Each structure stands twice: as structure tokens, then as C-alpha cells.
A protein has these predicted regions:
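A short hydrophobic beta-strand segment most commonly corresponding to one strand
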Residues: 106-125
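Short, charged/polar surface micro-motifs in flexible loops or helix N-caps
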Residues: 36-38, 46-50, 72, 119-120
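A short, N-terminal "cap"/entry segment at the start of jelly-roll beta-barrel domains
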Residues: 2-41, 52, 122-138
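Short beta-strand His + acidic residue motifs that chelate non-heme Fe in jelly-roll/DSBH
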Residues: 53-54, 75-76, 93, 98-104
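Short acidic-glycine-tyrosine-enriched beta hairpin
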Residues: 79-96
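Short, conserved beta-strand element in jelly-roll/cupin
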Residues: 44-46, 57-75, 114-116
Length: 138
């Protein structure tokens, strides 16, 4: 399944995302598309994989842009319904907004993640998305 997913992708899957594994349920993979000017990473999630709730903090600017590139996934801001991400879907995540993103339960998923430059930027990793919350998504 991973090999079939890799063939459908424009960007490499990359390496296991071990540095951030503690903030994910399931396995994810990371490929740095660009690290100059703006950080751009291809993040691949196995089916059911999602990251914890988190916040991209900044006093000015900051945040993140996600662009779906393969498979099917989800993005959710706290207090709002989840949004389906398909190839070509663009998600603008403002700084200081609690959210999570990851694969659908039945699909491999990949998105490009663009780190938006800002002042005093940092990431705050929070609690996992519960199975109860996640299992409601279809």
C-alpha cells in the first residue's frame, strides 16, 4: 500500500518522522522539499495517522499553509468541523490557532507544509486527537 501511494506522489515520501513521532498517532514520513527562504516539507501519513492538537505561535506573521498532494486527509481547528483535504486543497492556518491534521482512516495521505515566517515563532504541541473525535470523521 505504501509503495502504491509513493507511485501516486509528486514528491518523495522521505524518512520516518522520528523527531516528531511523540506528537503523532501512527507513522508519518518527512521529506524537506526546500529549507531556504521558506521551509517546505512533504509530510506523508499512513492511514489513520494524525498529529496531536498543536499551535503555531507567533507575535507577528507565522502560521502554516498546507496543500494536499496525494490521498485523503483531514484538517480541524478547535471548535470547528473537520475539513477534508484532497490533492489540490489549500488550508491556511493562522498563527495562534489550535488545530490538527492527518490521514483519513482508509487512506494514505500527503501534504506540503509551508512554514510562514514571523516573529517569535514556536510550536506548542498539545494533547492527542482522541479515537472518539477521530472516529466520527468519514
Amino acid at each position: 500500500a505504501m509503495r502504491a501511494h509513493a507511485k501516486s506522489m509528486v514528491f518523495p515520501i522521505g524518512q520516518p518522522n522520528d523527531a516528531f513521532a511523540q506528537y503523532f498517532i501512527g507513522h508519518s514520513y518527512l521529506f524537506p522539499v526546500s529549507t531556504s527562504q521558506v521551509g517546505v516539507f512533504n509530510v506523508t501519513f499512513e492511514p489513520g495517522c494524525r498529529n496531536n492538537w498543536h499551535i503555531h505561535k507567533a507575535t507577528k506573521g507565522g502560521g502554516q499553509i498546507l496543500i494536499g498532494v496525494a490521498g485523503r486527509g483531514w484538517y480541524q481547528e478547535e471548535g470547528k468541523p473537520a475539513v477534508e483535504i484532497l490533492p489540490g486543497t489549500v488550508i491556511h492556518i493562522p498563527a495562534n490557532v489550535k488545530h490538527w491534521h492527518g490521514a483519513a482512516a482508509d487512506s494514505w495521505f500527503a501534504h506540503l507544509a509551508f512554514e510562514i515566517t514571523g516573529e517569535k515563532t514556536s510550536n506548542e504541541w498539545l494533547e492527542p486527537v482522541t479515537d472518539e473525535e477521530y472516529d466520527k470523521l468519514k
